Amino acid sequence: MIGYLEGRVVARRDRFAIVLTPGGVGYELELPTPVAAALPAPGGQVSLFVHTVVREDALELFGFASLDDRETFRTLIGISKLGPRTALAILSHFTADDLLRVVASGDAEALVRVPGIGKKSAQRIFIELSYKLEGRAPAAGLAPSVPIPGGVAGDVVAGLTNLGYPEPEARQVAAEVLEAEPDLDVAAALRQALKRLASAKK
């Protein structure tokens, strides 16, 4: 598995580059837009952290300027129904620290700025991301604990935990309910969540 590359930029475009290593092998990498924009002109030297995706018919490489951004990419692709292209699109709009601040502030709506992510998907991604990033804090030093998501999702999670449900289970069912019906108010969403939890125990 390729985890790091150093070499000379041969070509670059909006979200990809070809890097020629000293061994004479040229690697094509997909990149977050800001990383691609910051690359030197062809002929310049670059070093990138790499995530490798092995498929039956292809070997895909995703490049990042920092180890934190690569680890955040790996966290994102661990979210259900979120593939590497969507993760790359998110990291084209937010750095690793930006995402930690989004989670810490409870601002799920911020994710809607990413092309291809609607309100329903943003709520689901936000809740799963909050759980996965628990205990991490941005470099600026926001509190390391991840709060319960804001808005309707946060109220549903709070209501379920007050009823004795474990927080991870509450976050998961809240995400499922609001993904299915993103316009529910708190009371209706809580009722749906309780129905799902009751059905799961049968």
Curated annotation (Swiss-Prot):
It is found in: Cytoplasm. The keyword DNA-binding applies. Its main location: cytoplasm. Keywords: Cytoplasm, DNA damage, DNA recombination, DNA repair, DNA-binding. GO terms for biological process: DNA recombination; DNA repair. Has three domains with a flexible linker between the domains II and III and assumes an 'L' shape. Domain III is highly mobile and contacts RuvB. Residues 66-144 are annotated as: Domain II. This is Holliday junction branch migration complex subunit RuvA. Residues 145-155 are annotated as: Flexible linker. GO terms for molecular function: ATP binding; four-way junction DNA binding; four-way junction helicase activity. The RuvA-RuvB-RuvC complex processes Holliday junction (HJ) DNA during genetic recombination and DNA repair, while the RuvA-RuvB complex plays an important role in the rescue of blocked DNA replication forks via replication fork reversal (RFR). RuvA specifically binds to HJ cruciform DNA, conferring on it an open structure. The RuvB hexamer acts as an ATP-dependent pump, pulling dsDNA into and through the RuvAB complex. HJ branch migration allows RuvC to scan DNA until it finds its consensus sequence, where it cleaves and resolves the cruciform DNA. Residues 155-202 are annotated as: Domain III. CDD domains: UBA_RuvA_C. GO terms for cellular component: cytoplasm; Holliday junction helicase complex; Holliday junction resolvase complex. Belongs to the RuvA family. Homotetramer. Forms an RuvA(8)-RuvB(12)-Holliday junction (HJ) complex. HJ DNA is sandwiched between 2 RuvA tetramers; dsDNA enters through RuvA and exits via RuvB. An RuvB hexamer assembles on each DNA strand where it exits the tetramer. Each RuvB hexamer is contacted by two RuvA subunits (via domain III) on 2 adjacent RuvB subunits; this complex drives branch migration. In the full resolvosome a probable DNA-RuvA(4)-RuvB(12)-RuvC(2) complex forms which resolves the HJ. Residues 1-65 are annotated as: Domain I. The keyword DNA-binding applies.
